[in-house]
């Protein structure tokens, strides 16, 4: 099985995110890049049912699935775009109540940093990406724009 450690990390994180109420059901997704491959949560699988062997593996350059019985998350393009834009090795995309509420506020383009970790790892504020339909190239582009000059 490819990317055993990354798949286990994703499975463990899914359990924590679900237990902490940061995701509900199948909302949100996670990915971890190792070299030319990316492990990503599969589409439509509740986090409580996640197992390493169910995590999809795709090519970093193309997004083509190379392993896993289930198709990758519908936000695969968003993950690949964010990984490329930031140079980071993982993406955690939750649908927490707070994040969903903020994303729904019209006219809000950024939130002030309320914790020093935001400044250490992200920037002086938290940017809000412009709305676009889930899974669309437009949403991936909007996220990349919000991440310009940032690592998170």
List the model feature ranges, each with a label:
Residues 1-152:
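Glycine-rich flexible loops
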